[in-house]
Design a protein with these regions (language model features):
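Hydrophobic beta-strand segments that make up the repeating blades of beta-propeller
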Residues: 108-112, 155
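Repeat-based blade/solenoid architectures
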Residues: 37-39, 83-94, 140-151
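Beta-propeller fold detector
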Residues: 80-83, 136-141, 180-184
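Acidic carboxylate motifs that coordinate Ca2+ or other divalent cations, activating on Asp/Glu
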Residues: 103
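Residue-level signature of beta-propeller blades and closely related beta-rich strand-turn architectures
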Residues: 112-114, 161
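Beta-propeller blade repeat segments, especially FG-GAP/WD-type strand-to-loop junctions
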Residues: 71-75, 118-138, 169-177
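Calcium-binding motifs, dominated by EF-hand helix-loop-helix domains
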Residues: 96-100
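Acidic, small-residue rich beta-repeat scaffolds with periodic aromatic anchors
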Residues: 9-10, 16-22, 30-64, 147-184
Length: 184
């Protein structure tokens, strides 16, 4: 009687042929994810700013959702802002700190997704409120686009007007809010 047997050498050889490329592919995709900053759960801290009494950490929640965790260094009070953007979801890519209204307090611009299939990102502007000691999203800016400083107490927002044209709305800070000045 002839016994059936499986050649372990052949099975092991097949396993090696399958396993080695699988491991190589896994390492490659992990390296790409780390290089792009697209590792869910890995926090990054915004670079220190002189006399800035807050620490800002970016915590990716998925490949496009993130939390900006803002900690007051003095009171240890935490504020969390959730937003969306494209990778890399790192603090140095998503956060800008600037005193846009020249009130002596820092303001935060968070970068979002490109708007209307364009190269312009939809930024969110958070102004520091000294009474609440929190950053509050401004409601005075009507267009979603990239926000830039343009002189003392003024900003402009680049945005896509339609499928062919881009535009800029200019605002200046007066009496505690942003006032529309002109469109260019």
């Amino acid at each position: 009687m002839k016994k059936n047997h499986i050649s372990l050498g052949g099975a092991m050889q097949y396993k090696k042929l399958f396993t080695i490329p699988f491991i190589a592919l896994s390492l490659f995709s992990t390296a790409c994810a780390v290089q792009s900053g697209n590792v869910v759960g890995k926090e990054s801290v915004y670079p220190p700013v002189a006399n800035f009494s807050f620490e800002i950490k970016i915590k990716p929640l998925s490949d496009m959702d993130y939390q900006a965790i803002i900690t007051n260094k003095k009171t240890k009070k935490i504020q969390i802002i959730e937003s969306m953007s494209h990778p890399p979801l790192t603090a140095d890519n998503l956060v800008q700190i600037q005193d846009l209204n020249n009130d002596g307090y820092p303001d935060i611009i968070l970068k979002g997704f490109p708007v209307a299939a364009s190269a312009i990102n939809g930024n969110e502007l958070y102004m520091f409120n000294p009474e609440t000691k929190q950053f509050e999203e401004t409601k005075d800016i009507t267009q979603l686009g990239e926000i830039h400083a343009s002189g003392k107490n003024c900003i402009y927002v680049d945005y896509r007007k339609n499928s062919m044209e881009y535009s800029q709305d200019h605002y200046c800070w007066r009496n505690g809010k942003w006032h529309f000045i002109e469109n260019r």
